[in-house]
Amino acid sequence: MSLKIIIIGGVAAGAKAAAKSKRLLPDAEVHIYTQDTCVSYSSCGLPYYIAGDFEDWHKLIVRTIEEFEKSGVHIHKLNRVTKILPADKKILVKNLETNECFFVEYDRLIIATGSFPYKPEIKNKNLKNIFTLRTLQDGINIRETMEKSNHITIVGGGYIAVELIEAFVKNGKNVTVIERSAFILSVFDEEISSLIQTFILENSNDRVKILNEDTVSEFVGEDKVTGVVTQKGFGFETDMVIISAGVRPVVDIAVDAGIELGVTGAIKVNSRMQTSIPDIYACGDCVEKINMISHTPVWFPLGSTANKEGRVAAINACGGVEDFEGILNSAVLRYHALNISMTGLTEKAAQKLGFDTVSVVITKRDRAGYMPEVQNVTLKLVADRRTHRVLGAQAIGCGDADKRVNTVSVGLLSNMRVEDLLDVDLTYAPPFSTSIDILISAARILKSKLS
């Protein structure tokens, strides 16, 4: 009898798990149940659709429902899984169009429920024109409302918030950001996040205002939002609001089924994406990860990680053996010409974990100074004082900041020491780098500090 694999959720991890399962076991019965109207789309691309970088939102769909069905993967859209019954190996499903509820049996279950936007308790937060960005429909709604708006408020200052600031400014909108930290992108160390905030303010045609160390006390309006009042007493008019105050893992049905959560509040899995209950796997934004430097549990949801985990979950659910060892918190984004990237531990994160850190911040040209496209890059390199192990890197600049960070990312996997980084044989030609790359220069300074 063929194996029946049920997957809950189908955006990134779930879609990857379904496709991989069908390729591994062509005779298996593979089903995706999703409360969404679409599957397998790039939610990471939504800010760029909103910006108008491309006009057709269909380009965000990686694989259509019709393509899945043709391959033998059955898609059940607008079907919400409301309960998992592990003892009976069944799920309870509610059809959101007909309200019909029914049971479905499984041999293997893969949970890929993702994450949901966190909405703080703010007075009148349910007024019209207050949005969060998670689904394809959210992106479509935000773009349509943006086109009719002049002033937009963003609550929060993380990755998505920065991408949306860029999108709105590009479309000639005025933006006010309310951020509870001293600088936006507070996941970075302050030397870097302060430079990012300065760049945004100086390169936005005076359209951006950032209210740091403040929060929203209430939204103003009767039917739709017309204004914002902050905890510090600032009040201003606005046409729409984006709440971008972080996300949380969707774990309610897992908890109800008795599946163990980790210390981060996400589903706890082993390296084979197995949960605490046999034949139930989990992957993507709903699961806890392991930081490969500190070997501690973390929750850092990214689309690239979700795809890797979906693949590993499928292999193991189909009877194979594959491990996903963890993450390095590698990330990249941009604000207009500014590239922003990081990998590994920031200095503040490393210190919280007990590392005795040494760091350097250096600014240097990204290629030969006589090349017309030369730009500056600012790099922060962090190491452990005792072992000299490189712990992480952060880089920003209008030049190629991200390729320096990617180089460090590879080194982190091999426990690279500062001295090892000095020996890396990087490529050189005037259009691509300086003869002594900024990465090598930073390592030299770090070595001097360590000795």
Where are these regions (language model features)?
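FAD-site-proximal beta/loop scaffold in flavoenzymes
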Residues: 126-149, 220-229, 235-315, 407, ...
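Glycine-rich dinucleotide-binding loop and its adjacent helix/turn
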Residues: 111-171, 209, 263, 269-271
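A conserved FAD-binding loop/helix module that cradles the flavin
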Residues: 269, 283-346, 431-450
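Flexible, glycine-rich terminal cap/loop adjacent to redox cofactors
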Residues: 2, 8-12, 20-27, 35-36, ...
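Catalytic nucleophile loop
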Residues: 11-14, 158-161, 314
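Rossmann-like dinucleotide-binding cores of NAD(P)H-dependent redox enzymes
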Residues: 60-61, 151-153, 159-218, 300-306, ...
